[in-house]
Amino acid sequence: MSYDYHQSWSRDGGPRGSGQGSSGGGGGGSRGSGGGGGGRGGRGRHPAHLKGREIGLWYAKKQTQKNKEAERQERAVVHMDERREEQIVQLLNSVQAKTDKDSEAQISWFAPEDHGYGTEVSSEKKINSEKKLDNQEKKLLNQEKKTFRITDKSYIDRDSEYLLQENEPNLSLDQHLLEDLQRKKTDPRYIEMQRFRKKLPSYGMQKELVNLINNHQVTVISGETGCGKTTQVTQFILDNYIERGKGSACRIVCTQPRRISAISVAERVATERAESCGNGNSTGYQIRLQSRLPRKQGSILYCTTGIILQWLQSDSRLSSVSHIVLDEIHERNLQSDVLMTVIKDLLHFRSDLKVILMSATLNAEKFSEYFGNCPMIHIPGFTFPVVEYLLEDIIEKIRYVPDQKEHRSQFKRGFMQGHVNRQEKEEKEAIYKERWPAYIKELRTRYSASTVDVLQMMDDDKVDLNLIAALIRYIVLEEEDGAILVFLPGWDNISTLHDLLMSQVMFKSDKFLIIPLHSLMPTVNQTQVFKKTPPGVRKIVIATNIAETSITIDDVVYVIDGGKIKETHFDTQNNISTMSAEWVSKANAKQRKGRAGRVQPGHCYHLYNGLRASLLDDYQLPEILRTPLEELCLQIKILRLGGIAYFLSRLMDPPSNEAVVLSIKHLMELSALDKQEELTPLGVHLARLPVEPHIGKMILFGALFCCLDPVLTIAASLSFKDPFVIPLGKEKIADARRKELAKETRSDHLTVVNAFEGWEEAKRRGFRYEKDYCWEYFLSSNTLQMLHNMKGQFAEHLLGAGFVSSRSPKDPKANINSDNEKIIKAVICAGLYPKVAKIRLNLGKKRKMVKVHTKSDGLVSIHPKSVNVEQTDFHYNWLIYHLKMRTSSIYLYDCTEVSPYCLLFFGGDISIQKDKDQEIIAVDEWIVFQSPERIAHLVKGLRKELDSLLQEKIESPHPVDWDDTKSRDCAVLSAILDLIKTQEKATPRNLPPRSQDGYYS
């Protein structure tokens, strides 16, 4: 098949011999449907025979048809000028001739001043498709070797450095370690720390703990917060090995659920051992892109759970590790649940491996059962008594009367928070409704009538911030000194409570230090949490659940438990994430209570009634049951853990079959898995990258299209967090600064790129400039530095896989197109598709605004923090977004305006259709553009060549040589990039193409 230009183009507008274009979903529909009808209806009026509701339905139908026609007329026009059209025809004919004849095309099209696309197609041999199919399994195995050629190069995965060190027994080292420990015992610093350690409940159980661990392969240790299990158990094991003359054989790795925990615990243990952390001493830590490694043997390493999962790719048996301690497993995060199952399998091959599971008290038995009823041991906690108060106690104590506007929610949601359909929640809601009258009746025997009346009046489905403010005021005026810790579900509650307190003259004085604690807050503010206040100053910390386990604030005496916690769930039926404030679990409530009473007797105020307390879940739902599974599915395949569904079925709490099937379907649509659920070459690359699959695909395309540096900035931000902070009281200024950084890009992603590049420039000029820049634009320098480190890690992965030739994200060869905003947007589209939304201008009476729709959800909203939230002057009708989440509404997070060519070349399947008088080209049947049919066929042909080229690049990665103008790679990519770059800013709306040969330019 050849592509003919103008003179020999076939009558139907398509390539010669192509036949008539298909006429699918854009079909015209019947003429006059919904028109005036019969009878005396006319001039747009309804037919006379219609009555009542029928009239309303008639007008609604007519308005729908009117809207559809308006939308049809607003379709953007896909166009190209005659010169580009002729060049693309020649390019496609030449490539087609190369395929048909398997010989080199001698046509020369390249002329730099004429936008030509190469001179000839190179004579590289193509892989025979039949041979590829026959050798698919062998090819995938070879592909894995090609994809991760790190050990053959100078690149070493720094996060795996500790694992890859040898761990052979060494008698002379054993003796040295013993002598070193004996010397320590005479060190005044060590002796001083021993006095503290001996006060911990765990210290008195040292022999019992060590004997149990030495005599069993798996041990479960439970213990209250503050008992010393995290800091002491690892030291007991190490010292026991050293004292028995086996120190070199001991290599302990202890997982932590959070980065901050891994660092702070490692530093604490090092201090107790009279050492510095890392630097070849006995204790160190490893988190992503940051480490202080201990000595090779006779050591303790604290690390995040993800580090061990990463190690398993290099050494599936963790050969150099003697003890694995899985800490805080009661939190049930996704990674720790998966690691438990992997370790359970590993025990069959590593009979010498010791596994210690450490959990809160309440559910230790469940972990023991999962590991074949292994032995358990409990370490008692050490806290002062804490008095607990329920909502009715608080109302009675402070004589609280709510605003008259507050009314009970009439059980409109009860336990069914958000939009998550959980049967057990519905059952508890029914029980709550049933028991409520009897509970109120019983309360009247113990509390004043006014208290019970207030309790009935309140909408306890909401967090009553006025009540919390009144309670804080009561504590300050009536109770003894001591810090106050308030638990709230999210940023909006924290911000509002802060404003409520600061609106009162009393709290504006220097007698109070009010500290909001949230991931959006500047880090410098959060460090104040740990500092003791001067005499006469009361600390008030307003925090999310980060303060439950991740950090310890020693001087807290009063805890106010708001009773709610923000949880993300994944709705498999509607394929959408939801975030809502759920009731806390009993385990959460216990942890919160435990934050008081660390230094003296404490008080804990729970903002829910006794009936609610009795029906709380024992624990939060494990993360694996409320999150998308795509990234995990790729990990299962790259670690060779067997079939995805089979492996997941063996977890402690397996996810639903619907969630597993949906994730596998998404990965197949992304071409990461084939029909046999095996990794494709693209899937191998995506599994190796430490990001979710869509972001991984964006990274690969950033390398292929040579706009690496900005794309890595975007990828790092999406997989970690953006660098913006929101100081309380300055939200509007922060929004304005963010829009200033957007620079008319209509893109949250490019706003982050601009912020990052500005920071790099300021940093080059010196520390003062960097500090001023971050202050002016409300940026976190710590987060920006983390993004910088992550970009380096991504670039090293790409180097190891062969996609780039340098480990520097700023390598000039990998950034030829980094200054072109439109190409970067195309790469964003390539990664995030099919997360597409349609923009429709809505000319209201008061002001111009836009409405945004997605294919599956209908009307949605752009998130208020987006630079596009108030934008009305879009160049195109389409947005690509990173995340869609339902809270109070369905919001799109991190969105970018994209052009028609971005969607045509990097979207889904293309079809060419007719819609009444319009010739159209559609992507996945719903993203529709006007286009002369011959132009549509050229675009489709060019897209086919791009798909073929990308497949070859993924199967055999190597950088594009843009200097080799004879190559097919360079010719095809140059043609596509040229069309994207020259796409007009605005496409005329409400106008059909001028003629078959006409163009909008």
Curated annotation (Swiss-Prot):
Residues 470-640 form the Helicase C-terminal domain. Residues 210-380 form the Helicase ATP-binding domain. CDD domains: DEXHc_DHX36, SF2_C_RHA. Residues 258-310, 491-550, 631-690, 842-853, 863-893 are annotated as: Necessary for interaction with single-stranded DNA at the 3'-end of the G4-DNA structure. It is found in: Nucleus; Cytoplasm; Cytoplasm, Cytosol; Cytoplasm, Stress granule. Residues 622-691 are annotated as: WH domain. GO terms for molecular function: ATP binding; ATP hydrolysis activity; ATP-dependent activity, acting on DNA; catalytic activity, acting on a nucleic acid; DNA helicase activity; double-stranded RNA binding; G-quadruplex DNA binding; G-quadruplex RNA binding. Expressed in spermatogonia stem cells and primary spermatocytes (at protein level). Expressed strongly in testis. Weakly expressed in heart, lung, liver, kidney, small intestine, spleen, lymphe node and thymus. It catalyses: ATP + H2O = ADP + phosphate + H(+). Residues 380-621 are annotated as: RecA-like domain 2. The modification Phosphoserine is found at S154, S956. Residues 1-193 are annotated as: Necessary for nuclear and nucleolar caps localizations. Belongs to the DEAD box helicase family. DEAH subfamily. The DHX36-specific motif (DSM) form folds into a DNA-binding-induced alpha-helix that together with the oligonucleotide and oligosaccharide-binding-fold-like (OB-fold-like) subdomain bind to Myc-promoter G4-DNA-containing structure in an ATP-dependent manner. Upon G4-DNA-binding, DHX36 pulls on DSM in the 3'-direction, inducing rearrangement of the RecA-like 1 and 2 and the degenerate-winged-helix (WH) regions; these rearrangements are propbably responsible for the ATP-independent repetitive G4-DNA unfolding activity, one residue at a time. This is ATP-dependent DNA/RNA helicase DHX36. It comes from Mus musculus.
